[in-house]
């Protein structure tokens, strides 16, 4: 099936929603994270099941225990509803979480099952289910390259 130009724009806008989510959670940017969800949206994320904006606030404290995180998203599958205002999708995710107080890297593998809604000209998540595939923790060993000359990442808006 071919897409119209408007449908292609909708698909790209939905992909941008996923990017906003990842950037918001990785930078501990509450407003950016909330901007991925409608205020009346919901999220089922492990032990948290409820309002998506409350989930965003939950993430701010939950993710503060790591030095930095990287939510890497890929394999987007998006199905647009014929009404032009609803879509469903699946997004694969591998998250790298660097522990704050130990030289340990936690890696999380999973998928997001999303329901999107378009209001006006804007797409956001209406409902998300986070599916866990696997996790691992491993000690971090130094690489052979000198990384001291690079700007070091952290959980904030600037790096």
Predicted regions span which residues?
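Short, low-complexity N-terminal intrinsically disordered segments enriched in polar/charged residues
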Residues: 1-23, 27, 31-36
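Flexible, active-site-adjacent loop/turn segments at secondary-structure boundaries
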Residues: 3-6, 46, 106
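A solvent-exposed, acidic/Ser-Thr-rich amphipathic alpha-helical stretch
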Residues: 27-95
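Acidic side chains
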Residues: 10, 26-29, 43, 114, ...
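A beta-strand edge to alpha-helix "cap/lid" segment located at domain peripheries
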Residues: 64-159
């Amino acid at each position: 099936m071919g897409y119209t130009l408007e449908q292609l724009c909708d698909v790209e806008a939905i992909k941008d929603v996923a990017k906003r989510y990842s950037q918001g959670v990785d930078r501990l940017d509450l407003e950016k994270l909330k901007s991925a969800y409608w205020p009346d949206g919901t999220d089922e994320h492990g032990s948290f099941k409820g309002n998506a904006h409350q989930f965003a606030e939950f993430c701010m404290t939950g993710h503060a225990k790591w030095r930095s995180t990287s939510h890497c998203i890929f394999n987007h599958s998006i199905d647009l509803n014929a009404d032009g205002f609803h879509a469903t999708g699946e997004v694969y995710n591998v998250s790298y979480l660097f522990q704050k107080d130990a030289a340990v890297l936690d890696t999380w593998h999973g998928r997001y099952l999303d329901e999107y809604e378009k209001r006006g000209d804007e797409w956001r998540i209406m409902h998300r289910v986070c599916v866990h595939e696997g996790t691992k923790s491993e000690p971090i060993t130094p690489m052979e390259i000198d990384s001291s000359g690079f700007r070091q990442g952290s959980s904030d808006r600037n790096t």
